[in-house]
Amino acid sequence: QLAPWRHRTNAGIYVQSVRIARIQIEHATAATYPNADSLTLEWGGSARALNRPVLLDPRASWHTVNSGSFVSADNVQEPDVYAVLPRAWLAHGVLRGVRTTAFDPTNTNQRDDPAAMRAIANWPGTQEAERALKNNFYTAINEDDARVTAGNQAPYKTVAEPWLYDRAATMFVLYSRSGSFKALREAVRATDFYADRVNATGHFSLAAGDTKYAYNESMAYSYWLTGDATLLPAISRVVDAQQGFSHVWSPQLGFWTERHTAFKLLANVVAYEVTGSSTLRDRVTTILADLRRHQDGANGQVPTPRIDGGLYHTGEQHGDWGPELGASPWMSVLVTDAIVRAYGSGEDAATAQFLLRMGRYMNSSLVLDPEDPYGTGAPALASLYATLLNGGDAFGEGGQEEHSLEVAAHIAWGYYFSDLLGAPEPALRQRALDLYETYDAGVNFWIRPTAPASGLAAYRVSPPRKWGWEHRTADAMAFALGLNAPAPTLFTSGFE
Protein backbone atom coordinates (compact mmCIF):
# COMPACT_ATOMS: atom_id res chain seq x y z
CA GLN A 1 0.00 0.00 0.00
CA LEU A 2 1.38 3.41 -0.99
CA ALA A 3 -1.38 5.40 0.70
CA PRO A 4 -4.64 4.85 2.59
CA TRP A 5 -7.44 7.39 2.64
CA ARG A 6 -5.96 9.55 5.36
CA HIS A 7 -8.15 11.43 7.81
CA ARG A 8 -7.00 14.11 10.24
CA THR A 9 -9.61 13.34 12.91
CA ASN A 10 -10.78 9.77 12.29
CA ALA A 11 -7.84 7.41 12.54
CA GLY A 12 -10.10 4.43 11.91
CA ILE A 13 -10.29 5.30 8.23
CA TYR A 14 -6.59 4.46 7.92
CA VAL A 15 -7.19 0.78 8.63
CA GLN A 16 -10.49 0.59 6.75
CA SER A 17 -9.28 1.80 3.38
CA VAL A 18 -6.69 1.56 0.65
CA ARG A 19 -6.30 4.52 -1.66
CA ILE A 20 -3.19 3.57 -3.62
CA ALA A 21 -1.74 0.06 -3.85
CA ARG A 22 1.34 -0.94 -5.79
CA ILE A 23 0.93 -4.22 -7.65
CA GLN A 24 3.78 -5.91 -9.50
CA ILE A 25 3.35 -8.86 -11.84
CA GLU A 26 5.45 -10.61 -14.45
CA HIS A 27 3.75 -10.34 -17.82
CA ALA A 28 5.07 -10.92 -21.33
CA THR A 29 3.38 -8.25 -23.42
CA ALA A 30 1.86 -9.39 -26.68
CA ALA A 31 1.01 -5.95 -28.03
CA THR A 32 3.32 -3.20 -29.19
CA TYR A 33 2.60 0.53 -29.18
CA PRO A 34 0.18 1.99 -30.16
CA ASN A 35 -1.70 -1.19 -29.28
CA ALA A 36 -2.02 -2.43 -25.70
CA ASP A 37 -2.67 -5.54 -23.67
CA SER A 38 -5.82 -5.57 -21.55
CA LEU A 39 -5.45 -6.98 -18.04
CA THR A 40 -8.15 -7.46 -15.41
CA LEU A 41 -7.43 -6.86 -11.74
CA GLU A 42 -9.76 -8.52 -9.25
CA TRP A 43 -9.79 -8.73 -5.48
CA GLY A 44 -12.02 -10.25 -2.83
CA GLY A 45 -12.16 -13.67 -4.49
CA SER A 46 -9.76 -16.59 -4.64
CA ALA A 47 -6.29 -16.13 -3.24
CA ARG A 48 -3.61 -15.40 -5.82
CA ALA A 49 -1.54 -18.33 -6.96
CA LEU A 50 1.78 -16.50 -7.38
CA ASN A 51 3.84 -14.16 -5.26
CA ARG A 52 6.80 -12.02 -6.19
CA PRO A 53 9.70 -12.64 -3.79
CA VAL A 54 10.70 -8.97 -3.73
CA LEU A 55 9.39 -5.71 -5.12
CA LEU A 56 11.49 -4.32 -7.93
CA ASP A 57 12.48 -0.69 -8.28
CA PRO A 58 10.10 0.72 -10.92
CA ARG A 59 12.88 3.00 -12.19
CA ALA A 60 14.83 -0.06 -13.31
CA SER A 61 12.40 -0.32 -16.24
CA TRP A 62 12.47 3.30 -17.40
CA HIS A 63 14.19 4.83 -20.41
CA THR A 64 15.24 8.24 -21.69
CA VAL A 65 12.60 9.98 -23.79
CA ASN A 66 13.95 10.68 -27.26
CA SER A 67 10.94 11.81 -29.28
CA GLY A 68 7.86 13.99 -29.10
CA SER A 69 7.63 16.52 -26.28
CA PHE A 70 11.21 15.91 -25.11
CA VAL A 71 14.46 14.77 -26.69
CA SER A 72 17.42 12.89 -25.24
CA ALA A 73 19.25 16.08 -24.28
CA ASP A 74 16.38 17.01 -21.93
CA ASN A 75 17.20 13.88 -19.86
CA VAL A 76 13.53 13.13 -19.20
CA GLN A 77 12.77 9.55 -18.15
CA GLU A 78 9.59 7.50 -18.52
CA PRO A 79 8.45 3.90 -17.89
CA ASP A 80 8.94 1.24 -20.54
CA VAL A 81 5.33 0.17 -19.90
CA TYR A 82 2.40 2.25 -18.65
CA ALA A 83 -0.62 0.94 -16.75
CA VAL A 84 -3.59 2.90 -18.12
CA LEU A 85 -6.68 2.76 -15.93
CA PRO A 86 -10.33 3.10 -17.01
CA ARG A 87 -11.63 6.67 -16.96
CA ALA A 88 -14.88 5.66 -15.26
CA TRP A 89 -12.81 4.37 -12.33
CA LEU A 90 -10.39 7.31 -12.30
CA ALA A 91 -13.31 9.76 -12.15
CA HIS A 92 -14.17 8.45 -8.69
CA GLY A 93 -11.41 10.76 -7.45
CA VAL A 94 -8.51 8.54 -6.46
CA LEU A 95 -5.97 11.14 -7.59
CA ARG A 96 -7.33 14.59 -6.69
CA GLY A 97 -9.52 13.31 -3.89
CA VAL A 98 -12.80 14.63 -5.33
CA ARG A 99 -15.19 13.00 -7.72
CA THR A 100 -15.29 14.26 -11.27
CA THR A 101 -17.20 13.09 -14.33
CA ALA A 102 -15.61 10.95 -17.01
CA PHE A 103 -15.62 12.30 -20.55
CA ASP A 104 -18.62 11.55 -22.72
CA PRO A 105 -17.90 8.49 -24.91
CA THR A 106 -18.07 10.66 -28.03
CA ASN A 107 -15.11 12.70 -26.75
CA THR A 108 -12.26 10.57 -28.07
CA ASN A 109 -8.62 11.01 -27.12
CA GLN A 110 -7.65 12.52 -30.47
CA ARG A 111 -7.52 16.25 -31.16
CA ASP A 112 -10.82 17.36 -32.69
CA ASP A 113 -11.06 19.09 -36.04
CA PRO A 114 -11.05 22.83 -35.24
CA ALA A 115 -13.53 23.74 -37.97
CA ALA A 116 -15.99 21.15 -36.69
CA MET A 117 -15.60 22.39 -33.12
CA ARG A 118 -15.99 26.04 -34.12
CA ALA A 119 -19.26 25.17 -35.88
CA ILE A 120 -20.85 23.75 -32.72
CA ALA A 121 -21.98 26.64 -30.54
CA ASN A 122 -22.92 24.63 -27.44
CA TRP A 123 -22.44 21.17 -26.01
CA PRO A 124 -24.61 19.47 -23.36
CA GLY A 125 -23.63 19.89 -19.72
CA THR A 126 -19.95 20.72 -19.34
CA GLN A 127 -18.81 18.94 -22.50
CA GLU A 128 -17.54 22.22 -24.00
CA ALA A 129 -15.01 22.46 -21.17
CA GLU A 130 -14.12 18.79 -21.54
CA ARG A 131 -13.43 19.20 -25.25
CA ALA A 132 -11.36 22.30 -24.54
CA LEU A 133 -9.36 20.54 -21.82
CA LYS A 134 -8.40 17.91 -24.38
CA ASN A 135 -7.94 20.05 -27.49
CA ASN A 136 -5.96 22.76 -25.71
CA PHE A 137 -3.72 20.04 -24.27
CA TYR A 138 -2.37 19.52 -27.77
CA THR A 139 -1.54 23.21 -27.96
CA ALA A 140 0.16 23.00 -24.55
CA ILE A 141 2.51 20.26 -25.78
CA ASN A 142 3.05 21.99 -29.15
CA GLU A 143 1.13 19.42 -31.17
CA ASP A 144 -1.74 21.63 -32.31
CA ASP A 145 -0.60 21.79 -35.94
CA ALA A 146 2.76 21.16 -37.63
CA ARG A 147 2.57 24.62 -39.24
CA VAL A 148 2.68 26.51 -35.92
CA THR A 149 6.00 28.36 -35.87
CA ALA A 150 8.49 28.04 -33.02
CA GLY A 151 7.83 31.58 -31.85
CA ASN A 152 4.15 30.74 -31.36
CA GLN A 153 4.73 27.54 -29.40
CA ALA A 154 4.75 27.13 -25.62
CA PRO A 155 8.36 27.54 -24.37
CA TYR A 156 7.96 25.01 -21.56
CA LYS A 157 11.59 23.86 -21.61
CA THR A 158 13.16 27.26 -21.02
CA VAL A 159 10.58 29.56 -19.38
CA ALA A 160 8.67 29.20 -16.11
CA GLU A 161 5.42 30.81 -17.27
CA PRO A 162 3.82 27.72 -18.90
CA TRP A 163 4.25 25.88 -15.58
CA LEU A 164 2.26 28.37 -13.52
CA TYR A 165 -0.82 26.68 -11.97
CA ASP A 166 0.95 23.32 -12.38
CA ARG A 167 1.12 22.28 -16.01
CA ALA A 168 1.88 18.62 -15.19
CA ALA A 169 -0.96 18.30 -12.67
CA THR A 170 -3.37 19.66 -15.29
CA MET A 171 -2.27 16.83 -17.58
CA PHE A 172 -3.12 14.37 -14.83
CA VAL A 173 -6.56 16.01 -14.56
CA LEU A 174 -7.05 15.29 -18.26
CA TYR A 175 -5.95 11.70 -17.74
CA SER A 176 -8.25 11.20 -14.76
CA ARG A 177 -11.27 12.22 -16.84
CA SER A 178 -10.34 10.74 -20.22
CA GLY A 179 -8.25 7.67 -19.46
CA SER A 180 -6.01 8.83 -22.30
CA PHE A 181 -2.64 7.11 -22.55
CA LYS A 182 -1.19 10.16 -24.26
CA ALA A 183 -2.34 12.41 -21.41
CA LEU A 184 -0.84 10.04 -18.83
CA ARG A 185 2.42 9.74 -20.74
CA GLU A 186 2.82 13.50 -21.14
CA ALA A 187 1.92 14.02 -17.48
CA VAL A 188 4.60 11.59 -16.31
CA ARG A 189 7.15 13.12 -18.67
CA ALA A 190 6.31 16.67 -17.60
CA THR A 191 6.53 15.65 -13.95
CA ASP A 192 9.96 14.12 -14.47
CA PHE A 193 11.14 17.32 -16.19
CA TYR A 194 9.71 19.44 -13.36
CA ALA A 195 11.02 17.23 -10.54
CA ASP A 196 14.54 17.34 -11.97
CA ARG A 197 14.32 21.13 -11.56
CA VAL A 198 13.08 21.21 -7.97
CA ASN A 199 16.20 22.60 -6.35
CA ALA A 200 17.64 22.05 -2.88
CA THR A 201 15.31 24.65 -1.35
CA GLY A 202 12.21 23.12 -2.97
CA HIS A 203 11.72 25.81 -5.61
CA PHE A 204 11.37 25.33 -9.37
CA SER A 205 14.73 26.28 -10.83
CA LEU A 206 13.16 28.16 -13.75
CA ALA A 207 11.54 30.44 -11.15
CA ALA A 208 13.97 30.14 -8.25
CA GLY A 209 12.69 31.56 -4.97
CA ASP A 210 9.10 32.07 -6.20
CA THR A 211 6.70 29.86 -4.25
CA LYS A 212 3.85 30.33 -6.71
CA TYR A 213 5.79 27.91 -8.93
CA ALA A 214 6.48 25.36 -6.16
CA TYR A 215 4.16 22.36 -6.49
CA ASN A 216 4.14 18.73 -5.42
CA GLU A 217 0.71 17.69 -6.73
CA SER A 218 1.92 16.18 -10.00
CA MET A 219 4.78 14.41 -8.23
CA ALA A 220 2.30 12.72 -5.89
CA TYR A 221 0.26 11.50 -8.84
CA SER A 222 3.30 10.22 -10.70
CA TYR A 223 4.51 8.42 -7.56
CA TRP A 224 1.10 6.81 -7.08
CA LEU A 225 0.67 5.82 -10.74
CA THR A 226 4.21 4.58 -11.42
CA GLY A 227 5.62 3.75 -7.98
CA ASP A 228 8.56 6.10 -8.58
CA ALA A 229 9.79 6.69 -5.03
CA THR A 230 12.59 9.00 -6.20
CA LEU A 231 9.94 11.73 -6.17
CA LEU A 232 9.39 11.56 -2.40
CA PRO A 233 12.27 13.86 -1.37
CA ALA A 234 11.16 16.53 -3.85
CA ILE A 235 7.58 16.31 -2.55
CA SER A 236 8.89 17.18 0.90
CA ARG A 237 11.25 19.91 -0.32
CA VAL A 238 8.34 21.74 -1.93
CA VAL A 239 6.66 21.88 1.48
CA ASP A 240 9.85 23.37 2.90
CA ALA A 241 9.88 26.02 0.17
CA GLN A 242 6.29 26.98 0.94
CA GLN A 243 7.13 27.52 4.61
CA GLY A 244 8.90 30.69 3.54
CA PHE A 245 5.55 32.37 2.78
CA SER A 246 3.50 33.80 5.67
CA HIS A 247 -0.12 32.80 5.08
CA VAL A 248 -1.43 34.55 8.22
CA TRP A 249 -2.57 37.95 6.96
CA SER A 250 -2.07 41.23 8.79
CA PRO A 251 -2.02 44.84 7.56
CA GLN A 252 1.71 44.97 8.34
CA LEU A 253 2.70 42.31 5.80
CA GLY A 254 4.47 43.62 2.74
CA PHE A 255 3.12 40.88 0.47
CA TRP A 256 0.09 38.58 0.52
CA THR A 257 -2.04 36.95 -2.17
CA GLU A 258 -4.64 34.20 -2.29
CA ARG A 259 -2.48 32.42 -4.87
CA HIS A 260 0.57 32.05 -2.65
CA THR A 261 -1.60 31.06 0.30
CA ALA A 262 -3.37 28.43 -1.78
CA PHE A 263 -0.21 26.78 -3.03
CA LYS A 264 1.19 26.64 0.49
CA LEU A 265 -1.90 24.86 1.78
CA LEU A 266 -2.06 22.57 -1.24
CA ALA A 267 1.58 21.51 -0.87
CA ASN A 268 0.98 20.57 2.76
CA VAL A 269 -2.27 18.73 2.00
CA VAL A 270 -0.70 16.71 -0.81
CA ALA A 271 2.40 15.84 1.21
CA TYR A 272 0.17 14.75 4.11
CA GLU A 273 -1.80 12.48 1.77
CA VAL A 274 1.45 10.93 0.56
CA THR A 275 3.33 10.57 3.85
CA GLY A 276 0.77 10.68 6.66
CA SER A 277 3.11 12.89 8.69
CA SER A 278 1.53 14.10 11.94
CA THR A 279 3.42 17.39 11.54
CA LEU A 280 1.79 17.95 8.16
CA ARG A 281 -1.58 16.83 9.49
CA ASP A 282 -1.45 19.42 12.24
CA ARG A 283 -0.14 22.11 9.92
CA VAL A 284 -3.05 21.59 7.50
CA THR A 285 -5.48 21.92 10.40
CA THR A 286 -3.73 25.08 11.59
CA ILE A 287 -3.73 26.72 8.14
CA LEU A 288 -7.44 25.99 7.77
CA ALA A 289 -8.13 27.62 11.13
CA ASP A 290 -6.00 30.63 10.18
CA LEU A 291 -7.95 31.07 6.94
CA ARG A 292 -11.29 30.84 8.75
CA ARG A 293 -10.09 33.54 11.13
CA HIS A 294 -9.07 35.69 8.15
CA GLN A 295 -12.48 35.16 6.53
CA ASP A 296 -14.11 36.20 9.81
CA GLY A 297 -12.24 39.52 9.74
CA ALA A 298 -8.76 38.66 11.02
CA ASN A 299 -9.58 39.47 14.65
CA GLY A 300 -11.12 42.82 13.76
CA GLN A 301 -8.39 43.93 11.35
CA VAL A 302 -10.84 43.84 8.41
CA PRO A 303 -13.56 46.41 9.08
CA THR A 304 -17.29 46.06 8.62
CA PRO A 305 -19.49 46.45 6.68
CA ARG A 306 -18.03 44.21 3.99
CA ILE A 307 -19.13 41.61 1.48
CA ASP A 308 -18.76 38.38 3.42
CA GLY A 309 -16.54 35.49 2.42
CA GLY A 310 -13.47 37.07 0.83
CA LEU A 311 -9.94 37.00 2.18
CA TYR A 312 -9.35 40.75 2.25
CA HIS A 313 -5.90 42.32 1.99
CA THR A 314 -4.54 45.53 0.53
CA GLY A 315 -3.91 46.06 -3.15
CA GLU A 316 -0.36 47.06 -2.31
CA GLN A 317 0.17 43.65 -0.71
CA HIS A 318 -1.38 42.00 -3.75
CA GLY A 319 0.51 44.19 -6.21
CA ASP A 320 -2.46 45.08 -8.41
CA TRP A 321 -4.37 48.00 -6.90
CA GLY A 322 -3.97 50.70 -4.26
CA PRO A 323 -3.97 50.73 -0.44
CA GLU A 324 -7.65 49.76 -0.18
CA LEU A 325 -8.67 46.38 1.19
CA GLY A 326 -9.91 43.97 -1.44
CA ALA A 327 -9.91 40.34 -2.54
CA SER A 328 -9.54 38.46 -5.82
CA PRO A 329 -12.37 36.12 -6.83
CA TRP A 330 -10.38 34.17 -9.39
CA MET A 331 -7.34 33.77 -7.13
CA SER A 332 -9.74 32.68 -4.39
CA VAL A 333 -10.50 29.69 -6.63
CA LEU A 334 -6.99 28.42 -5.90
CA VAL A 335 -7.72 28.65 -2.17
CA THR A 336 -11.03 26.82 -2.40
CA ASP A 337 -9.44 24.14 -4.58
CA ALA A 338 -6.91 23.40 -1.84
CA ILE A 339 -9.58 23.60 0.86
CA VAL A 340 -11.99 21.25 -0.92
CA ARG A 341 -9.12 18.79 -1.02
CA ALA A 342 -8.35 19.37 2.65
CA TYR A 343 -12.02 18.84 3.49
CA GLY A 344 -11.61 15.24 2.39
CA SER A 345 -9.28 14.54 5.30
CA GLY A 346 -11.41 16.35 7.87
CA GLU A 347 -15.07 16.45 6.77
CA ASP A 348 -15.81 19.18 9.30
CA ALA A 349 -18.69 21.63 9.19
CA ALA A 350 -16.42 24.64 9.72
CA THR A 351 -14.52 23.94 6.50
CA ALA A 352 -17.76 23.30 4.62
CA GLN A 353 -19.08 26.64 5.88
CA PHE A 354 -15.90 28.38 4.70
CA LEU A 355 -16.43 26.99 1.21
CA LEU A 356 -20.08 28.04 1.15
CA ARG A 357 -19.18 31.58 2.19
CA MET A 358 -16.43 31.73 -0.42
CA GLY A 359 -18.89 30.59 -3.08
CA ARG A 360 -21.23 33.40 -2.07
CA TYR A 361 -18.34 35.86 -2.24
CA MET A 362 -17.41 34.76 -5.76
CA ASN A 363 -21.05 35.08 -6.77
CA SER A 364 -21.12 38.65 -5.44
CA SER A 365 -18.21 39.52 -7.75
CA LEU A 366 -20.14 38.83 -10.95
CA VAL A 367 -21.02 41.74 -13.22
CA LEU A 368 -22.45 42.19 -16.71
CA ASP A 369 -19.69 43.34 -19.03
CA PRO A 370 -21.17 45.59 -21.73
CA GLU A 371 -18.12 45.16 -23.97
CA ASP A 372 -19.30 41.72 -25.16
CA PRO A 373 -15.73 40.46 -25.82
CA TYR A 374 -16.81 37.22 -27.47
CA GLY A 375 -19.25 38.80 -29.91
CA THR A 376 -22.41 37.13 -28.62
CA GLY A 377 -24.55 40.23 -29.10
CA ALA A 378 -25.26 40.61 -25.39
CA PRO A 379 -23.36 41.71 -22.26
CA ALA A 380 -21.26 38.91 -20.80
CA LEU A 381 -21.52 37.78 -17.19
CA ALA A 382 -18.03 37.76 -15.67
CA SER A 383 -16.25 38.08 -12.35
CA LEU A 384 -14.25 41.14 -11.44
CA TYR A 385 -10.49 40.71 -11.11
CA ALA A 386 -10.61 42.05 -7.55
CA THR A 387 -13.33 43.53 -5.36
CA LEU A 388 -13.32 46.09 -2.57
CA LEU A 389 -15.03 45.63 0.78
CA ASN A 390 -18.26 47.03 -0.67
CA GLY A 391 -18.08 44.82 -3.76
CA GLY A 392 -16.76 47.56 -6.04
CA ASP A 393 -14.20 47.02 -8.77
CA ALA A 394 -10.76 47.25 -7.13
CA PHE A 395 -8.77 46.71 -10.30
CA GLY A 396 -10.80 49.02 -12.51
CA GLU A 397 -10.90 46.81 -15.59
CA GLY A 398 -14.41 45.38 -15.35
CA GLY A 399 -15.36 41.78 -15.98
CA GLN A 400 -12.68 39.15 -16.51
CA GLU A 401 -14.27 36.70 -18.93
CA GLU A 402 -11.08 34.66 -19.24
CA HIS A 403 -11.53 33.46 -15.66
CA SER A 404 -15.14 32.34 -16.11
CA LEU A 405 -14.65 28.57 -16.04
CA GLU A 406 -12.77 28.24 -12.77
CA VAL A 407 -14.90 30.83 -10.95
CA ALA A 408 -18.07 29.08 -12.15
CA ALA A 409 -16.70 25.74 -10.96
CA HIS A 410 -16.07 27.09 -7.48
CA ILE A 411 -19.38 28.88 -7.18
CA ALA A 412 -20.63 25.36 -7.94
CA TRP A 413 -18.69 24.09 -4.91
CA GLY A 414 -20.42 26.78 -2.86
CA TYR A 415 -23.74 25.32 -3.96
CA TYR A 416 -22.54 21.79 -3.23
CA PHE A 417 -21.58 22.65 0.32
CA SER A 418 -24.81 24.55 0.92
CA ASP A 419 -26.59 21.31 0.08
CA LEU A 420 -24.20 19.29 2.24
CA LEU A 421 -24.92 21.62 5.16
CA GLY A 422 -28.64 21.04 4.76
CA ALA A 423 -29.76 24.39 3.31
CA PRO A 424 -29.33 24.29 -0.49
CA GLU A 425 -28.90 27.64 -2.23
CA PRO A 426 -30.13 27.03 -5.79
CA ALA A 427 -29.26 30.62 -6.74
CA LEU A 428 -25.57 29.65 -6.51
CA ARG A 429 -26.16 26.71 -8.79
CA GLN A 430 -27.87 28.86 -11.39
CA ARG A 431 -25.20 31.53 -11.27
CA ALA A 432 -22.52 28.90 -11.84
CA LEU A 433 -24.42 27.73 -14.91
CA ASP A 434 -24.91 31.29 -16.14
CA LEU A 435 -21.21 32.08 -15.78
CA TYR A 436 -20.34 28.84 -17.55
CA GLU A 437 -22.23 30.17 -20.58
CA THR A 438 -19.70 33.00 -20.80
CA TYR A 439 -16.88 30.47 -20.77
CA ASP A 440 -18.70 28.41 -23.40
CA ALA A 441 -18.83 31.40 -25.75
CA GLY A 442 -15.15 32.07 -25.17
CA VAL A 443 -14.11 28.56 -26.18
CA ASN A 444 -15.56 29.00 -29.66
CA PHE A 445 -14.21 32.53 -29.93
CA TRP A 446 -10.62 31.33 -29.48
CA ILE A 447 -10.83 28.47 -31.99
CA ARG A 448 -9.20 29.67 -35.21
CA PRO A 449 -9.38 26.91 -37.84
CA THR A 450 -7.36 28.82 -40.46
CA ALA A 451 -4.70 30.20 -38.09
CA PRO A 452 -2.06 27.48 -38.72
CA ALA A 453 -1.63 28.82 -42.25
CA SER A 454 -0.22 31.94 -40.55
CA GLY A 455 1.93 29.96 -38.11
CA LEU A 456 -0.55 30.20 -35.22
CA ALA A 457 -2.34 27.49 -33.23
CA ALA A 458 -5.91 26.67 -34.22
CA TYR A 459 -6.75 26.09 -30.56
CA ARG A 460 -5.41 29.31 -29.09
CA VAL A 461 -4.05 29.15 -25.52
CA SER A 462 -2.59 32.51 -24.60
CA PRO A 463 -0.78 32.93 -22.34
CA PRO A 464 0.31 29.27 -22.04
CA ARG A 465 -0.52 29.24 -18.29
CA LYS A 466 -4.19 29.79 -19.16
CA TRP A 467 -4.68 26.06 -19.73
CA GLY A 468 -3.72 25.40 -16.10
CA TRP A 469 -5.63 28.27 -14.51
CA GLU A 470 -8.82 27.21 -16.27
CA HIS A 471 -8.78 23.44 -16.05
CA ARG A 472 -6.75 22.18 -13.07
CA THR A 473 -9.31 23.40 -10.55
CA ALA A 474 -12.52 23.06 -12.62
CA ASP A 475 -12.66 19.29 -13.07
CA ALA A 476 -15.48 18.65 -10.56
CA MET A 477 -17.99 21.27 -11.71
CA ALA A 478 -20.49 18.79 -13.18
CA PHE A 479 -20.24 16.63 -10.06
CA ALA A 480 -20.73 19.59 -7.71
CA LEU A 481 -23.82 20.70 -9.62
CA GLY A 482 -25.22 17.18 -9.93
CA LEU A 483 -25.45 17.53 -13.72
CA ASN A 484 -24.88 13.87 -14.53
CA ALA A 485 -26.54 12.33 -11.50
CA PRO A 486 -27.59 13.36 -7.98
CA ALA A 487 -24.35 14.27 -6.22
CA PRO A 488 -23.56 11.73 -3.48
CA THR A 489 -22.18 12.88 -0.16
CA LEU A 490 -18.51 13.64 -0.61
CA PHE A 491 -16.07 11.09 0.82
CA THR A 492 -18.70 8.96 2.59
CA SER A 493 -17.17 5.57 3.39
CA GLY A 494 -14.35 6.19 0.98
CA PHE A 495 -15.06 5.30 -2.66
CA GLU A 496 -17.25 2.24 -2.94
Features from the language model and the residues they span:
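Short acidic, low-complexity intrinsically disordered linear motifs used
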Residues: 488-496
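Low-complexity, intrinsically disordered/propeptide-like segments
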Residues: 5, 59, 314, 493-494
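Alpha-mannosidase-like glycoside hydrolase catalytic domains involved in N-glycan trimming
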Residues: 1-55
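Catalytic cores of extracellular degradative/oxidative enzymes
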Residues: 56-486
